[in-house]
């Protein structure tokens, strides 16, 4: 053994002695599988597409409908005339309410699309949109947007017992 080998062995001995009480770190990181992340991404994208479908119906420019400001109502099919009568006298109570006053047109349209998506998912029949007074921009636009959506059966300016002329009550055809 030469001098450098003995020095090296002493250094190694001291090194092992210093690190003898040290234990290996336990790995506690949980790695998500790629499949789980893909499934989550697919669910998120599916939900976004469903909301965009309803938003597309609202922003479609196929036809223009004008409404009389005294009595705002809409009926998709004449077969639902008795439903409109019940809607006018206040027999239907909204199962979900959306308040859009204070929002601009695009935000209100997106929120209305989300509301219609929720109504489809949870099979809600009656909903209400509160547009407020303001400059009557949303008051004029919401009936037009609702009339463009194929699932809306009928709507009517809310009866006095539900909030006067600041909201619209509408009925949605269930998907089943």
From Swiss-Prot:
Its EC number is 3.1.-.-. One of its GO terms (biological process) is rescue of stalled ribosome. It is an enzyme of class 3 (hydrolase). InterPro entries: Smr_dom, Smr_dom_sf, SmrB-like. Signal peptide: none annotated. Keywords: Endonuclease, Hydrolase, Nuclease, RNA-binding, rRNA-binding. It comes from the Bacteria. One of its GO terms (molecular function) is rRNA binding. Residues 98-173 form the Smr domain. SMART domains: SMR. Associates with collided ribosomes, but not with correctly translating polysomes. PANTHER family: DNA ENDONUCLEASE SMRA-RELATED, UPF0115 PROTEIN YFCN. Belongs to the SmrB family. Acts as a ribosome collision sensor. Detects stalled/collided disomes (pairs of ribosomes where the leading ribosome is stalled and a second ribosome has collided with it) and endonucleolytically cleaves mRNA at the 5' boundary of the stalled ribosome. Stalled/collided disomes form a new interface (primarily via the 30S subunits) that binds SmrB. Cleaved mRNA becomes available for tmRNA ligation, leading to ribosomal subunit dissociation and rescue of stalled ribosomes. This is Ribosome rescue factor SmrB. It comes from Buchnera aphidicola subsp. Baizongia pistaciae (strain Bp). The gene is smrB.
């Amino acid at each position: 053994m030469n001098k450098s080998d003995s020095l090296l062995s002493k250094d190694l001995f001291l090194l092992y002695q210093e690190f003898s009480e040290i234990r290996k770190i336990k790995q506690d990181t949980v790695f998500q599988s790629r499949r789980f992340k893909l499934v989550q991404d697919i669910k998120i994208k599916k939900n976004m597409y469903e909301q965009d479908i309803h938003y597309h119906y609202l922003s479609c420019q196929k036809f223009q409908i004008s409404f009389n400001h005294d009595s705002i109502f809409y009926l998709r099919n004449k077969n639902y005339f008795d439903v409109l009568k019940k809607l006018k006298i206040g027999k239907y109570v909204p199962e979900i309410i959306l308040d859009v006053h204070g929002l601009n047109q695009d935000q209100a349209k997106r929120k209305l699309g989300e509301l219609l998506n929720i109504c489809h998912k949870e099979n809600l029949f009656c909903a209400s949109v509160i547009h407020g007074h303001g400059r009557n921009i949303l008051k004029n636009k919401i009936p037009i947007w609702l009339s463009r959506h194929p699932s809306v059966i009928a709507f009517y300016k809310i009866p006095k017992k539900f909030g006067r002329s600041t909201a619209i009550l509408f009925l949605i055809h269930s998907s089943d």
